[in-house]
Amino acid sequence: FNTDVLMALHRKQNLSPLLQAVKEHRVVNPRGTEPFNVKSMFEVMTGSFKDRFHQEIVQRTPWTRQFYQRQTEGPDGETISDLIEWTRGHWNDLVLKPERGYSGHGVRVGVVNNDIEEAINLALSEGDYIVQEKIPLALWAEEIPYLNNEQIHIKQYQTDFRCLMGNTGLVGFVGRYGGVPTNVGSGGGFQPLAILGSDMSVRDAVVRVNDTIMNMDPGELLDVIAHQKNMAMDCDFTYLLGPVKIALRPRLITAGQIEALENYGEKLWADCLTLENLWLSGQLDDLIRIEEEELEIARMNPWQGSAAIIASDGLFGFGAEPLE
C-alpha cells in the first residue's frame, strides 16, 4: 500500500515497528519508490523530460498531465491554453483519475462516464488528479465465455495485463478482466495466463478455445467454476468477502511476445532509476505532491535499484482483441 495509507494506519494503530523496519531497509518495496510511483510521473515521461527515457517506454506511455487550470502541451504537440476547458471539449478521448489510488475509486472515463461536469468537479474538489489520454478500449478487449443460469455465453470484457519487474529482470505477469475499470475492487477478476506453443495466431487460438468451452456441458463447466473457487480459497486468493473471480479462458501470449516484454521490462527498470535520480536531484519537486511526513519516510529508505517489484501495464496488444 501507499505511504499515505501507511501513515493513516500509523496514526490510529501506532506502527512504529514497521517504520523502524523501513528505516532499516527491511521492507519491499522500499518506501523510496513512492515519490516516483504516482501517476503524475507519466507527465514526466510524456512531457519536457521525455528525451531522458527510452523511446519505446515513452511510446508505450499514454499522454498525461496533472489536472488543474494551466497551459500545457497536448498529445499531438499542440498548445493547450486552458487544460480544464480543453478536457471539457475532448472528454470522449480522455480519462480523469487520482494521482494515487486503488480499486478504481474516483476514476472517470470518457464515454463510459458521460457527465463531464461531474467528472471535472470531482477532480478539482478532490485535488491531485491527472488527465490522461484514453487508450482505445478495444485494444484490451477480449471475448471470454461465462456461465449464467446453466447456459454458456460469450461476452466482451475489458482486460489489462501487467508486467512484474524485479532487479533480476521480468519475474511474472498479472492479467485482469471485468468492466471499466478492471480493478478487482470494482468487481473485476483475474485472467490466468497460457503460452501459445503452436504456430497459429493468438486470435485463431482464442477462437478455438472459446468454441471448445462453448461446446462443453454446462454441468461440467459448473464443476470447473467450483474447482476454481476452491483453489482460490485454499490459496487465500480472496478479496474482501470471498474468492476472487477467475476467467474461464486464459489470456494467450506467445514466446516471442514474452521476449519482447523482457526487453520492455529492462528498459522500464532503467527508466525508473532515471525517475528516482530526477526526484533525488530536486528536478521533480513541482510535480510530486506528497506530504512532507511521507517524503521523510521515503528518504529513510531510498530505492537505488535494490530489490523491488515494479508493475507496469504499458500500451501493447497481443492480437486477441475482437475484430471490428
Model-assigned labels for residue ranges:
Residues 1-324:
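Preference for protein termini
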